[in-house]
Regions:
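Glycine-rich phosphate/adenosyl-contacting loop at the front of the ribokinase-like
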Residues: 1-35, 39-53, 75, 87, ...
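A glycine-rich helix N-cap at a beta->alpha junction
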Residues: 50-69
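Structural recognition of alpha->loop->beta junctions
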Residues: 54-58, 156-190, 279, 283-294
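Conserved phosphate-binding/catalytic region of the ribokinase-like
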Residues: 152, 190-372
């Protein structure tokens, strides 16, 4: 009821998109370092204490001076009795106004630890995103991007930050993987269109290398996805973004997810009969960059009853964390990891925790047939 206090069940926990992804990846067996910033306030000190007591190390966390006006980022979600989100409030100013020397700390971390992947979420400002991604590119570390929200998803499409540019097409792409939902994908597509990214000569050269035929293309897309998604333009928009982000996992809510990615020349999927239904195009030229285009719709791992749903807040983060744990392994293939990642999401959906501890049970299901 508005304009008055209401009875509620209130719980507190360490969280945030980056924390959840890191914890899920850790549960799934990956070696993970969470890197973020907190203030020297009650929330920041509490978070560092919880990290020290958890499976995640606090060594990647930088604590800023609360006297300088910094506040540890906090997020408050209000859910209804069905556990669906009604309203949320976020204080993320610290992720926008960090001191300029923070990039030196990140550079040192990446140089010393030499990770295979850096996962970055769009809670950071466009300026800081640019710094993080530049460090990853310099160190030849692959970047996975989690858009977080419709509003924040466009932060990689800012002309003044040079993150995604007309020139940053495969193989010069700056982001290797992104995991938007359908609303974020549509917004990212429109932002790229506004930047004229689909008009550059580099984009056209890359798109033409896919050698996609317009004849029967709608029927093929419908056979892989469904008419509703095609009419909405979801697979088409994903394809047009591929030159800039060559691996997309589009979250479709209760419809599962859509995987769209570029195959390199000679990829086993191009000659595997079992993969034929998912090969949207094959390059017949002598391109050393693109061998074909793979698109596959993954239905939900499980239909979860309403009375089994505990929280919807961390399911996407859990899915990405499990996916990254697999991709960090030598030999892992993204299409084989997605069903496992979906199982992780289901376990979190049934848990009161932002990331279900039962994700640990998925360690043995992560395969070793690498593509990314």
């Amino acid at each position: 009821m508005p304009y008055t206090s209401n009875p509620a069940i209130i719980t507190q926990s360490a969280g945030g998109v980056g924390y959840n992804i890191a914890l899920a990846a850790k549960y799934a067996g990956a070696s993970v370092l969470l890197s973020s910033i907190v203030a020297d306030d009650l929330a920041g000190r509490s978070l560092l204490k919880q990290l020290a007591e958890s499976e995640l190390s606090p060594k990647g966390i930088k604590q800023l001076n609360h006297v300088d006006g910094f506040r540890t980022a906090q997020y408050v979600a209000v859910n209804d009795k069905k556990k669906d989100l009604v309203m949320a409030m976020a204080d993320m100013a610290i992720l926008h106004d960090s001191p300029p020397d923070i990039s030196d700390d990140w550079q040192s971390l990446v140089s010393s630890r030499k990770p295979k992947w850096i996962v970055v979420d769009a809670n950071w400002s466009a300026t800081l995103l640019s710094q993080i991604i530049s460090i990853a590119n310099k160190e030849k570390v692959k970047v996975a991007f989690e858009p977080v929200s419709v509003q924040k998803s466009v932060r990689i499409f800012q002309p003044d930050q040079q993150i995604v540019t007309p020139e940053s097409v495969v193989p010069r792409h700056r982001i290797s993987l992104a995991t938007p939902n359908v609303f974020e994908l549509e917004t990212m597509y429109e932002a790229a269109k506004k930047m004229a990214l689909f008009e550059s000569s580099e984009w056209w050269e890359s798109i033409n290398s896919f050698e996609m035929s317009s004849a029967g293309s709608r029927d093929k897309l419908v056979s892989i996805t469904n008419a509703e998604l095609v009419d909405r333009g979801i697979p088409q928009q994903a394809i047009q973004l591929l030159p800039y982000i060559p691996n997309l996992v589009v979250k479709l809510g209760d419809q599962g997810c859509l995987l769209v990615y570029l195959l390199p020349p000679g990829d086993p999927n191009l000659s595997n009969p079992a993969s034929a239904p998912y090969i949207l195009s094959r390059a017949t030229n002598d391109s050393s960059i693109v061998g074909g285009l793979y698109m596959r719709h993954f239905p939900p791992a499980e239909i979860v009853r309403q009375d089994e749903i505990m929280s919807v807040n961390g399911i996407g983060d859990t899915m990405l964390g499990v996916l990254m744990a697999g991709l960090a392994k030598e030999g892992a293939r993204v299409e084989e990891l997605i069903p496992v990642a979906q199982q992780g999401a289901v376990r979190t959906l049934k848990s009161v925790a932002a990331v279900s501890p039962e994700v640990r049970g998925l360690k043995g299901l992560i395969g070793i047939k690498k593509r990314l």
